[in-house]
């Protein structure tokens, strides 16, 4: 093939990425209108649509390339020259880092995830030195309290692009100042100033003002979630100023933000200062660039692997009936493989499990479901695999493994944030920590249900505890929509011996769920049962679940808060 064809292919891939990111920005730019019009169902649809855009445009480019090459075979040297031409197109390209990931995706689609080497792919960036480049235009604006904090905040809120009236702007400003004064003191506040991102961050039913509070002691987050009333008036719900609070807002268990970012790398660098605990992958994930986040996540994994001599081991916790889970002892992620054969009580297929994981990817995760990254043909060095894990892999997933001598290839796996399994956490804590964990677990169930998600298997082992103490669901094989479940009361026993029988005295159909039965396994531990009955007894009533179903069917979309109820201004300051 000619050298001109190699350049044409490189240009076609980059043009395809341009088209994809253009549509990405187009969908994102509609977030303001959806918020102003309270079109919450459109918010959910836009979230799904934006996720699908990437794979759709990869497919379009692949079809173009097949037409261009007209079915001719391509040797290794040809492919290397295509990558070389593509690399030459990137030095002046503003979104070079995501363009590299797009190239990887096109290659993987064309060659069915085979021969994934650094020579053929951008396993590592071709331009790592550009990460801290000069930003062409300011991402944020500085505001100084020369005339006090009230006029400063008035100016910030008045400059917002939102076209709705405020419910009571002066009240909200008073609340913000009260929070800042209480937290930092008047003297420190007088010597501080704000830097506020030019673009709002939209998610669910809120528009987030994201900024930095620059104090004499250092830089802190400054986050204002702006909501609208049913009457279409704006109000600030709270003010968050700690890195822990910001980390939860930008957490891995939440849906991606809609924020207009023509230069995503620049935005990621700007955010890094107020989210010091977040990796590059997590920051890209938070702003919706999930495919590039996958690239960065893989790079973080390779870096960890290169700087440790740890072996892969089975992950701590109760062994799953559907998934085989392993990890590196010091790494903050786990690797999950769908087993070849499931336990008898798991009547489902591998395709069903994959569909459940995709549902979670596209759905509003409300801070209660862990995001995952999906990989194919994942290579592991045998010397890094503990013998016990290797035996387990060969027993539980032989069809998923290709033996290459010194390496194995895992045909398909998921990577997910590592957490402490809730059942293990509950064994280790007591007192207030135990109470907090049970409260968190019940709240997780409620928030998932309100978002039209029924976990299916609600055992403690299927939930994890994050480093911030939040309880997050991570076992998705029985997940379904709330509206697909038939919540029933257990019929009254006909005779006393009915309750002693091994089989139920009533009929049970597929999709039937009896919430009264939850009590048997959620309250079995005498330390936990009384706490659960105190805080979450309504979860054992079928009418509670049916009432939620009614609200969902009527089109109601619940409010989701990335902070505790007591932090809301309406509870904290209202008389």
UniProtKB/Swiss-Prot annotation:
ATP binds at residues 315-321, 336. Its EC number is 2.7.11.5, 3.1.3.-. It is found in: Cytoplasm. It catalyses: L-seryl-[isocitrate dehydrogenase] + ATP = O-phospho-L-seryl-[isocitrate dehydrogenase] + ADP + H(+). One of its GO terms (cellular component) is cytoplasm. One of its GO terms (biological process) is tricarboxylic acid cycle. Belongs to the AceK family. This is Isocitrate dehydrogenase kinase/phosphatase. It comes from Citrobacter koseri (strain ATCC BAA-895 / CDC 4225-83 / SGSC4696).
